[in-house]
């Protein structure tokens, strides 16, 4: 994808910095083709594209492709996240989530087909992901931007808004 240099506004910088640091820590050779999704991409869109949005959520969602196609990378992400101060818990829908400082982290994977399959165990990472339809739209059309010492991937705005239009009636 295209690379941009991200200069976030002072108001969003601290929160977005936490999210980007978490992404970098989790993405080190483990979450192949993972990207930040959900409302946390909006401050990035605002800085890069001038799209205005008032961030009101502390949910941090990462879309993941479940494994590198040539080798299963084993890593205890549950341990990694909890070592960063997050507490893991199982939501009412059975999805594993992590919480700290008002943030709630969740992993989302593409769900092919139309039926609900519950949570998706990802044994090689010691966690589970919530399978949702049409996540592949977000993962297939993404942008990478520089942030501080690292970079972060997120859906291209066109893909993000198309995804919202498709899932809104559901």
Feature roles, as predicted:
Residues 1-170:
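Compositionally biased terminal segments of proteins
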